[in-house]
Design a protein with these regions (language model features):
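Short Gly/aromatic-enriched secondary-structure transition segments
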Residues: 26-38
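Well-ordered beta-strand positions in beta-sheet-rich domains
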Residues: 30-32, 55, 94, 140
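Exported/periplasmic cell-wall-interacting domains
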Residues: 60-145
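N-terminal post-signal-peptidase region of extra-cytosolic proteins
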Residues: 1-9, 14-15, 35-59, 79-83, ...
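A short, polar/charged loop/turn motif at coil->beta-strand junctions and beta-hairpin connectors
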Residues: 6, 27, 52, 65-67, ...
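Short glycine- and Lys/Arg-enriched binding-loop motifs that mark or flank ligand-binding interfaces
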Residues: 32, 43, 50, 95, ...
Length: 145
């Protein structure tokens, strides 16, 4: 992977379908991503298939998820919970950065360029290996429209 320094922040630009790894102010890696099936707008409630927008933290790593590795985003925040509960809804949770479904087999190509998740941020398995290696728990993530 080379000497790229410590990853200080992850930035997602939903409109561009890009995830950037930053070391200080410098972008050291960027990836094409897939989002939730309803990509526009902030996640409001469980089941809306949206990817949240805002500032969060990467707070947990799961090597044994239903998808190829996953790193959890600290959604919902207190504000997210308050917003959903005002409508009498659950904000949802378990929003992750992850690879492809574990059972995808030869169909991996079918996911490329599509927004197919329930709100998570997906990359290829090879890219997930790299992100897994470079990004520590506690790293801030900003998800922009």
């Amino acid at each position: 992977i080379g000497n790229i320094g410590t990853i200080s922040e992850v930035v997602v630009r939903k409109e561009e379908r890009r995830l950037y790894l930053l070391s200080g102010e410098r972008v050291v890696r960027d990836y094409r991503i897939s989002l939730g099936k309803t990509p526009e707008g902030h996640k409001l409630y469980e089941g809306d298939s949206r990817t949240p927008e805002g500032s969060y933290t990467l707070d947990f790593r799961n090597p044994n998820s239903d998808f190829y590795k996953s790193i959890r985003i600290s959604y919902p925040s207190a504000k997210d919970r308050e917003l959903a509960e005002a409508w009498g809804l659950s904000p949802g949770g378990n929003i992750m950065i992850h690879g492809l479904p574990n059972n995808v087999g030869d169909m991996a190509f079918a996911y490329k360029g599509l927004d197919w998740t329930d709100g998570c941020i997906a990359v290829t398995n090879e890219e997930m290996d790299e992100i897994w290696q470079l990004v520590d728990v506690g790293t801030p993530i900003r998800i922009l429209p």
